[in-house]
Amino acid sequence: MGLSDGEWQLVLNVWGKVEADVAGHGQEVLIRLFKGHPETLEKFDKFKHLKSEDEMKASEDLKKHGNTVLTALGGILKKKGHHEAELTPLAQSHATKHKIPVKYLEFISEAIIQVLQSKHPGDFGADAQGAMSKALELFRNDMAAKYKELGFQG
């Protein structure tokens, strides 16, 4: 389920918009994730105490983590599917240390798509959305395969 060169170009074009404000996009993605799927918040000791959207928006730690998440994802997307070296340590930490289920990767993928739709409607039409969905699915499938190798049934 690889992407065509044209699809990767659509993904990387919109990702260029994200890179203009990685921390802001990342914060918004995490807030959307936590609001839409409150159970995901339980995996983050640093953020468990944040109950309202205002508290989340005011949290520098949340913004920093959003920056970390989207910086890592951007590095993976830029590899256009050849992301083994980037994925291995990420899968290792998410499977063994953080115990993040694959389902939560689906949830954050949805949040990423929603944030891109709301922040960049002109650059994120149906074709770009389809391409990004495929790229995120490729990422999730490869993470799930690594999880399996590590014996994590997330």
Curated annotation (Swiss-Prot):
Binding site for O2: 65
Protein location: Cytoplasm, Sarcoplasm
Positions bearing Phosphoserine: 4
Chain positions found as Phosphothreonine: 68
Subunit structure: Monomeric.
Gene3D superfamilies per UniProt: 6.10.140.2100, 6.10.140.2110
Domain Globin: 2-148
Family annotation (Pfam families): Globin
Binding site for nitrite: 65
InterPro entries: Globin, Globin-like_sf, Myoglobin
The name this protein goes by in its record: Myoglobin
Family per similarity comment: Belongs to the globin family.
Top-level EC class: oxidoreductase
GO terms under biological process: oxygen transport; removal of superoxide radicals
Chain's role: Monomeric heme protein which primary function is to store oxygen and facilitate its diffusion within muscle tissues. Reversibly binds oxygen through a pentacoordinated heme iron and enables its timely and efficient release as needed during periods of heightened demand. Depending on the oxidative conditions of tissues and cells, and in addition to its ability to bind oxygen, it also has a nitrite reductase activity whereby it regulates the production of bioactive nitric oxide.
Native species: Sus scrofa (Pig)
One GO molecular-function entry: oxygen binding
GO cellular component: sarcoplasm
Annotated keywords: Cytoplasm, Heme, Iron, Metal-binding, Muscle protein, Oxidoreductase, Oxygen transport, Phosphoprotein, Transport
PROSITE patterns: GLOBIN
Entry binding sites for heme b: 94
Chief site of localization: cytoplasm
Known EC number: 1.7.-.-, 1.11.1.-
Catalytic activity: Fe(III)-heme b-[protein] + nitric oxide + H2O = Fe(II)-heme b-[protein] + nitrite + 2 H(+); H2O2 + AH2 = A + 2 H2O
